[in-house]
Structures are given as structure tokens and as C-alpha cells.
Amino acid sequence: MRSIGPSSFGLRLAAQAIAAGEVIAYPTEAVYGLGCDPLDARAVRRILAIKRRPEHKGLILIGADLDALWPFILPLEPARMAEIEASWPGPNTWLLPARPDTPTWLTGAHATIAVRIPGHPLARALCAAWSAYGGGALVSTSANLAARPPARTALEVRHRLPKGPDLILNARCAGNPRPSLIRDARTGRVLRP
């Protein structure tokens, strides 16, 4: 498990690691996340194995901007999309209808996919570095074993997930006390406060 700082060089190394099929850990608004290329089935399944998370639950995708998320989602009516976009960047995850060709290793047993544009500047910069490297969206799931408390520091990632990520982007989380709010984009209903 390698650890790198949050410099522009570190972001390029993280993007290279993602392109090579590696799993990375990085800070978000509240907790550390595990990430990889969402189109790399092997890397996604490795994250699920690290977390001991069943595939049917689905995963969250983050992007530097909405353009990174469009390949995975179907739009809703303009007023609803404007509400969603106004909540970003920030700790607001929305369940949007998934495109029919979105892989089931991302959607799980759902017709929707969870997406957001993170408010943590480093998480957003990581997404931008990945996009510049030819990627787009990035898997984002809390760095923890299923049903266990998530890691909030790089050291906690190492201790809680010893068979965890290949690379840790070592920086502070933004200090939010809770992970992102999850809402159904069609109804606005809060699914996780």
C-alpha cells in the first residue's frame, strides 16, 4: 500500500494508478473513499471484495463535473436537473435513472445509479486528474468493511483495510460529521440523512 501527498504530482500518480486498474483511497467531505475506474470490472469487484460488500447494493460515482457522469445516467426534466446541479459540488448524492448500458457491477440490483460532484477540493481535483488522463467518473464508496465504521484518516485506512487499496492519497477529510446525503432524484425523498 503506497501513500502519496496531495500535490499535482500525486494526483497524476493517482490517475495513472486508476488507469492501471488499481484501487485507491482518497479523502472526501466526511470519510475516506475507495475508488477505481468504474468501467474496470476487475477493479470494481476488488473494491467489493475489500469491503465485503455484496454487488447487488450498487455503488456511488463521483465526477469533477456533470459531463463525467452523463455516460452513466439518464436526464430528468430540466427543473429537477437544475435542482440537482444546484446542490453540487457538495455532499449530496442523487439516485438518477441509469443508462441501459451502465454495468450491473455499478448499479447492483437497481435501475438507478448514485452520483455526485464532491465538495472536497481534493476529491474533485482527483476526478479532474482522472478525466485529464482519459477517464471520467470515479467509483466512490466508503473505506470500511461493510457495516463497520468508515476510515476518516489514511492511518485508519491502513489499519481497517490491511488488504485494501494499492494507493492512498494522504490528506484530511473536510470534517463533515456524516457521509453524503442520498436522495431519490425523481421524488426528492431522502434515503440516507
Roles of regions detected by a PLM:
Residues 1-193:
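Active-site-adjacent structural elements in enzyme catalytic cores
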